[in-house]
Amino acid sequence: MKKLLVLTIMDGFGFNPVKEVNAIEAAKTPNLDKIFAECPTTEIGASGMDVGLPDGQMGNSEVGHTNIGAGRVVYQELTRITKSAKDGDMMKNEALVAAIENCKKKGSALHLMGLLSDGGVHSHIEHLYALVRMAKDMGLTEIYVHGLLDGRDVPPSSAADFIDAANAEFAKIGAGKIATVMGRFYGMDRDNRWDRVGKAYAALVYGEGILTDDAAAAVRKSYETIDEDGKYLTDEFVLPTVIEGTKRIASGDSVIFFNFRPDRAREITRTFVDPDFAGFERRGGMLDLFYVCMTQYDASMPNVEVAYKPQSLKNTLGEYLAEKGMTQLRIAETEKYAHVTFFFNGGVEVEYRNEDRILVASPKVATYDMQPEMSAEPVCDKVCEAIESGKYDVIILNFANCDMVGHTGIFEAAVKAVETVDTCVGRVRASVEKMEGVMLLTADHGNADCMIAEDGTPFTAHTTNPVPFAVIGKECKLREGGKLCDISPTILKLLGLEQPEEMTGESIITD
């Protein structure tokens, strides 16, 4: 008989001491109560730096399953670049160093372009400051900043303050000068609106647009300007504005586009680097630039260097189990199927050898408060059958209810969702015990543990609360301070397999 291990992920199930807002506490959960009382149980981190996100940021299903399957903290781009700037790795980044060396060799200018805010969705202003410091430390003085103004991921009229802050920081560093500002409406289009992008390009290359000697003042003036629809021109819509006495982007120069999210960085980048670009006429033809994308915007993008290349996750749990000849099953309903397959496998779509997958259709309802049971029962039927078949070494199972119903903000529905999961967990446990296997019970992030905001309104987001980790079917001791990336090393320990060096997580079982 195979050495069976089942990992059951209760999506959106966090531990929250505040009972009044907590659908999990309000639910009747005899099976979970029994597990948490009788079996080795601890809390593990599922948010912030524990999963490669900034401190205090809630986790999500994609990040959670990626970290579980990888067996290591997988840093998201914002955190990855911030960490690189803080620990000095940025100074050694080949693409960034080469861009600066190009300017030194040719006596040309360095242009830093990107979203000028601390929103952290597309960019972060701290990354800009780090780049200016790096270029200054490497001996450059001609450093020009082309700021795309936000107003979506930060307040709509905050750009003037960001410009003031940037100017103060540049004065402190002793380098860096704002050369162009414009709303992201122009510089970060993603719908092939080439008339807008053309205006951005004209300002950056030809110096066409509103002329000013004070970027912040020009933006504040924009706030008082009404467009043809009768709306004030807030940050997102500020017209392309050129600061007098600054240089334009020209052949021989280096450009570093410091946005890390690809979707809104592709179009403006293509105007500079694609010889076949035909969205509008580039007067004078394509410029000869040393162009660096902060991350990979598009694998087919020509004539660019990439500063932070995609992370290749070698030896994820699924890949490693396949290599060891073990059989595995991934099972979830539609809403979480990609999470137990694609994300759990580190962004790899293909099935590994001896990896089976079962997809159960999620119910077709407008919102899941209308059917909080979702498809948990049919998922449970199929997984119990798979467990008792004796066919699998490892089964990865997800119950979607606590998360998907939690997002509706309907407290009573979330309670029903939790109770449904409790019933299913009890059935899965019975099947695992029948086969003398081991079950690990956990979650990827919180949600149903907080359904009411401080002001009394429905709370529909994820939480930053820790999640459970329980071991059913084996007596053992668990350490504190674990996180999601420690689950795969724990699984390998239980299976008696050596941990691959790529997995830097540590088993939660101490004996």
Stretch-by-stretch model annotation:
Residues M1-D511:
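Feature captures the catalytic ectodomains and active-site-proximal regions of enzymes
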